[in-house]
Amino acid sequence: MSLKEGAHTKWGVLKQKLGPQDPEQIEGNMENADPELCIRLLQIPSVVNYSGLKKRLESSDDDWMVQFLELSGLDLLLEALDRLSGRGVARIADALLQLTCINCVRTLMNSHRGIEYIVNNEGYVRKLSQALDTSNVMVKKQVFELLAALCIYSPEGHALSLDALEHYKAVKNQQYRFSVIMNELSTSDNVPYMVTLLSAINAIIFGTEELRKRVQLRNEFIGLQLLDLLTKLRDLEDEDLLIQAIVFEEAKSEDEEELLKIYGGIDMNNHQEVFSTLFNKVSCSPLSVQLLSVLQGLLHLDQSHPSSPLLWEALDILVNRAVLLADDCQNNNVEEVMDRLVTSKKHPSKEKRKPDKCTNQVNKSIQTDKPKDESCEEKTVKKDPVSSGIPADSLQLSDALLALPACVSPLHTPLSGDITSPSHFPSPPSPVVSNAIDRISTSSSLPPPLPPPLPGTELSLPPPPPPPLPGMGGISLTPPPPPPLPGMGGMLPPPPPPLPGMGGMLPPPPPPLPGMGGMLPPPPPPLPGMGGMLPPPPPPLPGMGGMPPPPPPLPGMGGMPPPPPPMFGMGTFTDEVVVARVDYSLGYLPKAYFKVNKPTLKMKKLNWQKLPPNVINDTHSMWASASSSNDTPEPNYSSIEQLFCLPQAVAKEPAAPVKKPPKEISFLDSKKNLNLNIFLKQFKCPNEEVIQLIEKGDRSRFDIEILKQFLKLLPEKHEVENLKSYQEDKAKLSNADQFYLLLLGIPCYQLRIECMLICEEVNLMTDVLRPKAKVVSSACDDIISSHRLPLFCQLILKVGNFLNYGSHTGNANGFKIGTLLKLTETKANQNRITLLHHILEEIEQNHTDLLQLPSDLENVSTAAGINIENMYSETSGNLKKLRDLQNKISTAATDVKDQYEKSIQECMDALKEVEEQLTDITQKKVKLADYLCEDSAKLSLEETFSTMKAFRDLFLKAKKDNKDRKEQAVKAEKRKKQLADEEAKRQKGENGKIIRKGAAKLEEGCIIDALLADIKKGFQLRKTAKTKTEADSCPKPVSSETTGTDGTDVKHVDHVGILPQIKLDSSLNLDGTEQHKSKSKDNCGENFDNKPVVIAPINLDTSACLMNISEQNAKLPVSALQEGANLKQNPDTFVKEQSAIVTTESSTHNNIDGSSVDKCTLGQSQWPSEISDEVDSKYHEMPMQVEHKERAVEGKCSLPKPSVLGTESSSNQNNALNEGSQQHHNNTANESLQQAQNSALSEASQQSCCHTGIKGSPQFQSSALNADSQPSHTSVVGSAQAQRNELDDVALQTRDTTVTEGSQVEEDKCNDEGYPEHKTMGEHPLNSSSHSTTLQQSSEDGQKVKRGSSKHKKKRRSSKHGEEDGVDSPTHKTRGCVVQ
């Protein structure tokens, strides 16, 4: 114990000296850090910094988040993640660092500002996808989750995710964009990671609303063997995996059904069915020739070729374009159609950076590394000057020089006569970048010469003169042409003049002799080390015309003696063959400067680097000056020769000759001799014993293979003659020859071996054929004698006649046995259920005995692998061999006859028994053919048994599938019940009030987490992606299905929701936004005098709710349409003027007529409490207004389930809303509901005010009738599938009654002023068409709706009751109403 205490004490002291290591304390330093400090800390990647940043991001507000993003915080995170992924995970610390970094990215994307910033800026998702290039499974899991959430978040996010996968495919040089997902799914054994991958697949598919796009994405995964992987994943029996698999299969089934409806019953995912339909479509027309040609061309495409996927993709694009052009190219010819198919609009930037072919090749020195199969454009991306380390001006000059050949045409002046091969004329090498830098260094004194020619150029043009030298300012020369392009033969490269200080290059030759006339000079000799190439030609003869002579070499360059002058009378340059002058750098050494002594012995070599002679010619060099002096020391050559000579090899004395043993004599060739010796060694006995075994007929040491090999090694005729003629010593013969001599001593040795072989073969064959024949015979009997098979076939016959009723295949009396294999091809409407599955379910319920059918076919399944035809052929062939041997034995020696006659007869008897069994099988085959109604001559037992075996396997598999499906259904039901229990527990708080979920979670800053939770639960059976989040999406336009014949909306409903009760102190104004500008165009200034008013909720997940307005006394203070008209005329002043204060009583909840409602219940669904909680506004709401709104939603009332909601004729739509009420009516909470309703409605009737009620409540209906108010036809039509709200908090209040409607707006601004009275209204009628137009316009503008600030959200959450009061269930989301 003392040692342990001492260790603990030392450890404590060490921790105190090292300082506090608690990460919580360190991370706490960033709790109040500003974005600048966080950016600086991010530049030092560490787990502590990332963890602290994660906490800071979770607690940050919108302003802080925006500033952090503007300071490139996200760029730093993604760059660090990319670098961490690129260097691998060699340590646990690296893996933890990666994980904390990706957690910061996820926290950033959890906020509305962060995910919108990523979606609106391309490149971030690509950078995120590069983090998949790591071995850290947890990091890849997080990346796939983020990509999946982006797919569901918005269409833009879905497109960016697909683009990121496409980018990753190009970076990793993969063949398909989804290969990374499928490779991970097929190789991983981590179940949570596999769940993430499968959910990512579902998110990619569900992320698009277009059916064809969904099918295309799903088929891409299916083409990568996803269906096979799903079968393996189901065997893991993980609940989350099963959810994702079920979601995938159900969505696939639904899409296939929808495709079947669209294409008239054609399975567009079945290649054979599509081809058959296409063939039947064009088979009787001339188009069949083109179809055949297209198919023949496609058949020639090799799918294993690397370019095959690109070709197929290009063909797919062309076909899609052809479909689009089908109705638009009637008057065009083939050429015009091809131009329209092939021509595509390209991005201007791509065309600008599309390089010329020659420029492409020249730029190789500054290319970045790309995969080999990438396009030409991608290979010409130049490196950044800062990262490459090359000065920017150097690269610019190099680029200008490299681009010169593309824009200047070379001068073509071909020479006549014979010219030596261009390979004999070397081109002066000069690297591009190095020359550019060298030219920059000397640009002040010498203009840069042209770059050298590229390899492969040919000679046909004299070089142009070099640029003028310093001091030749009066000479004006035109720019020389550029060097020839690669592959453009017939041009001589121009020689660039050497720059000062270029050590390895010879100066150009001096000017020609007087009278030469200035012929072009030859190019300078190449650099040293360019062996194998002849130097340039000598200068031309005097008197040759041409261009002016070149200038002399630069001063200080020295010079070597000029080349020898050419012979006079040589003729013109073009009439003779150019002869190259000798260059010392190519192996022709000049005369040595000093004498070298020759050693007498072979010496060891000194490994040095030899200078070329042309370098030493300079008089200023060390070697030239040293060689000219006489003081050079002389070495002691004799001592050097003794010390550094190679050792001399001493001649060995010839060894005494060894007597070789006498060579063996053999009459066999070497190969046969070797094979026979190998054969004899396996017996491991002397040759005499082997001969005795053969003579006695003992087969114990011989098997079939040995005997077959022995027959091949028997001596041939000439070998037998040679061995018999040998009369010398037998011991001199080889072992194989001696064995042959012993074998020749046995009479009829070959017949003996053949008899041994046939007996072995027959015995083995009969042992194999007897059980096979028995199995085949039993299989035939089992099929005929089975009583379950006919019953099963009768059941299938009845089902088939039912399915094929009315067609040419119906009313059948029987079917061929091969039909049993097609039961699985008929698929049910439900997923993974075929006709065979259903028939087995029927059997399990009503005919359980038929489930034992596979046991009747067990022998048939065994017989399926037997080749019966081979049995016949083997038996007949061996019988023939036995008869032949029997004839040979009858004429052989007596001992052979006595030895093998009995054995041969026994073999024949065994084969005859097998032959009898086969004959019996033939007879049973005829019976089986009659039993199955088949042709006995064409019936193949092998095919029949194979069909029955395949059917038996399908039977057992379908039986197992049914069992597994039932078990999975039980588990799913149990899981569903568990989730429902958890939902029920979470729905209510301590005081029984409803707690918000779903969209509220998104508002609280957990967008990614909410989306992933939705994905994990199976997307809540959603198939289409929602635009943005639930708060940002827009309602869909009203379809024609919900519109009546008279233009009014007619909707059948299933259930109703609770309408929030809001008591207004005064009229409620509608704040104008951009969305209402579009609405006011059709709806502004309308009167509703004696006409029914239709109030249609834009997005109600409840089916419908009704609201009645008295036709005679409906006088509302203002309508939303009037405010829309004012907004259209002057939106700015309208927003400032219009306001209202929403007030409620804290103790009681007032219903429509002002009476208190203690509690109202509704059986099916409830509306959300806060209508405007998810809608952002440019203007901040007042705190009192927020409180009033939260209180106003507590009132609830019961609504019945109406049958059909309709509208009356529109003849009374004038002056329905004329003036505002000036009074407010509030009843106390102690009055009963019935009394409050009767009194309120009676008072409202006497005062000729608008009476509004909600259908379905008997109290409301009776009170309304007693008050002599005509029933209204106002309808509140709910859209059960709508996602979003269009308007927010539009409340229409009368003196005694209140109409509340939620409207989605961007601005919720209210004050204490009342609504102005007696607004003038327009004359435009409001009908369903305008409503449809409004919804469509609102759908377009809905993308612009933004969320409210976090300040408002906090105020809403800090309401009086301390919790949210409404339910925002995924199936009941009420957002607002539109007055029609």
UniProtKB/Swiss-Prot annotation:
Question: Which family does the UniProt entry place this protein in?
Answer: Belongs to the formin homology family.
Q: Tell me the ranges covered by the GBD/FH3 domain, including all copies.
A: 1-330
Asked if the record carries the keyword Electron transport, the reply is no
| Annotated region described as Disordered, given as residue ranges | 341-391, 440-541, 1026-1049, 1188-1244, 1260-1380
Which residues fall in a compositionally biased region of kind Polar residues? 1206-1244, 1260-1284, 1294-1303
- What name appears for this protein in its UniProt entry? Inverted formin-2
Task: Tell me if Plastid is a UniProt keyword of this record.
Answer: no
Which residue intervals are annotated with compositional bias (Basic and acidic residues) in the record?
367-385, 1306-1322
List the Pfam families hit by this protein, alphabetically.
Drf_FH3, Drf_GBD, FH2
| Coiled-coil boundaries | 879-930, 956-991
Give every FH1 domain span: 432-592
Keywords on record: Actin-binding, Coiled coil
Q: Which residues form the WH2 domain?
A: 1009-1024
A Gene Ontology biological process term: actin cytoskeleton organization
Q: Which domain of life is it from?
A: Eukaryota
* Basic residues biased stretches: 343-352, 1345-1359
> Which residues fall in a compositionally biased region of kind Pro residues?
446-470, 478-541
Tell me where in this chain the FH2 domain is found: 593-981
Q: Which gene encodes it?
A: inf2
Q: Where is the composition biased (Low complexity)?
A: 1328-1339
> What GO molecular function annotations does the UniProt record carry, in alphabetical order?
actin binding; small GTPase binding
